[in-house]
Structures are given as structure tokens and as C-alpha cells.
Amino acid sequence: MIRIGTRGSLLATTQAGGIRDALRAKGHEAELVIVTTAGDQSAAPVEQIGVGVFTAALREAIADDVVDVAVHSYKDLPTAADPRFVIPAIPPREDYRDALVARDGLVLGELPAGSVIGTSSPRRAAQLRALGLGLEIRPLRGNLDTRLSRVSNGDLDGVVVARAGLARIGRLDHITETLEPVQVLPAPAQGALAVECRSEATDLVAVLAELDHADTRAAVTAERALLAELEAGCTAPVGAIAEVVESIDEEGRVFDELSLRGCAAALDGSDVIRASGIGTPDRAAELGLAVARELLDLGARALIGR
């Protein structure tokens, strides 16, 4: 029996349940084990309670042999590798975009100046401020249904959350606008899951690798390499999105390229630096480093710390 560790929220158990079902479909017995994390018990803003707070307890549960596998929202994982663990599977990614859930069915451009928007993410807050719409951005915690209720009960005019999360718990009908990357660039690895286990568990690594999706792995590798090179944590005002796209060479042959867009924003919205690049999926990390270095040359490090 493969024991899959997960946080107890509806979103987390839905994500982990998808991995359990995928393993069962391939003939492997699997079950969910709920692990309580410090992040779930704190009401403080994410940037105050520490990078990787939601993932640390799951990793310790693996190390203590309470569970065999942990399913993480990949964007929550620290960029620094932990040699005790390996990620054999990054399943196909959900929609990576952010989504607005606003009162009265409004889109961003229809919200009057002074409207109060809640978000858990400094990255979203910085980019929303940079749009120059005069919105008031407030920090937001709680599970997705709690965040949505802040709009329906009139506490907030809107919230911005990951579209993937709403999709996974069946709440897409609440979205009033899906935000394109040109408006708000998503977090590195947003919409992707990381399926993690002990490095030395070679048989389990082979089983989990059956669920891996090569294009998603390439994209996430580039995005997280960019984040790591900027020496920015998962709560920093940094956005990145990579996509595998088909191209045609001069002789008419189709081949895959990897495109990457990245940005760094001042938290007050006063400036956003953008850079992009194209590489190949098998050199995803190098592409991430190259785009990060372009951002650094443009002044990203000072901007992130502003």
C-alpha cells in the first residue's frame, strides 16, 4: 500500500486523490494520509510564516516513515533541493493562469478605483498594483471556499486566486475573469503538482515516474531555475511561465522549443521588469538561468527587495 501524505484542505485532498486514483489505475494500491502543517494552523500572511511552510510537515512525514509519498502544489516548494527527497512525477499541469472572482460579475477593468481586492500572494499584489487601476490590495488567507465567501458576503470586492485550484475543486463558475499572463504573470510552477518520495526508495521512484509528464517537467524546471537564480523564495514578487511549443525548421521538420517569460515587480507596483527567451526542453534549466540573468541585468534584485 502506497501511503500518500496530503494537507487536509479540500484542494489538497482533491489533488492527492487524483494521484491516488492514477496509481490505482496502473494497478498500485494507494491511500491518503492527512498531515497537519504549521501553515494550516497560522493566520499570518504567507511571507511571514516562511518559505515552504506548507511542505515542511509533509516532507518530515516522509522522513519519519509516516507516509511514502507527498503531493505538493509545486509552487509552494522551496527552490533549494533537499537531498533526502526526489520528485519522480510532475503530472500534466492544470491551467497556470490567475483568476478574478469579483462581485456582480465584474472584470478587472470594470471595478471602480478604490475597490478592495484580496490576494494571498505578493506577486499578484505587485502586478495588480502595477496595472494602475487604483485598486486597494489586501492580504488574504484561508482555503479557497473561505476566500470566495469574502466576496459573496461583501467583505471584499474581489479576490485573485490560482485558476487551477478553482478547477480542481469544481468552482470555475465563480470566475468573472481569467487573467492572461500579459496582465499578471503566474507564479513559477503554478498549476503543477510535485509528487515526492525518499531518494533511496528506488522501487517507488519507478512506480511514481509512470505519472510524469515531460513537457510539464521542462516548463516547471525552467521557471524554478529562474526563481532560484534570482535568489527569491516562493512568496517573492516574481512571475514566470514556460511552455513547450512546436516549431518548424528550414527543411519543414517539426521540433519542440521551450519559451519562457519572466518578471520581477516592486511590491508597491511602481515598476515591473520583464524578460523572455527561447530554448529547448532538454536544456530547460539553462533557459531559466539565462532569462533570470537578463532580469538581474535590468535591476531585478533591487526591485524585489524594494
UniProtKB/Swiss-Prot annotation:
- EC number(s) for this protein? 2.5.1.61
Q: Which residues form the signal peptide?
A: none
Q: Name one GO biological process term.
A: protoporphyrinogen IX biosynthetic process
So which domain of life are we looking at? Bacteria
Cofactor or coenzyme needed: dipyrromethane
Alphabetized, the UniProt keywords read:
Porphyrin biosynthesis, Transferase
Note the InterPro entries from the entry: HemC, Porphobilin_deaminase_cofac_BS, Porphobilin_deaminase_N, Porphobilinogen_deaminase_C, Porphobilinogen_deaminase_C_sf
Q: Name one GO cellular component term.
A: cytoplasm
Q: Report the co-factor binding details.
A: Binds 1 dipyrromethane group covalently.
Q: Which GO terms describe its molecular function?
A: hydroxymethylbilane synthase activity
Residue numbers carrying S-(dipyrrolylmethanemethyl)cysteine: C234
Report the top EC class in one word: transferase
| Catalytic reactions on record | 4 porphobilinogen + H2O = hydroxymethylbilane + 4 NH4(+)
Q: Which family does it belong to?
A: Belongs to the HMBS family.
As for what it does, the entry says:
Tetrapolymerization of the monopyrrole PBG into the hydroxymethylbilane pre-uroporphyrinogen in several discrete steps.
HAMAP family named in the record: Porphobil_deam
Relay the record's extra comment.
Answer: The porphobilinogen subunits are added to the dipyrromethane group.
Complex formation: Monomer.
- Name of the protein in question: Porphobilinogen deaminase
| Gene this chain is encoded by | hemC
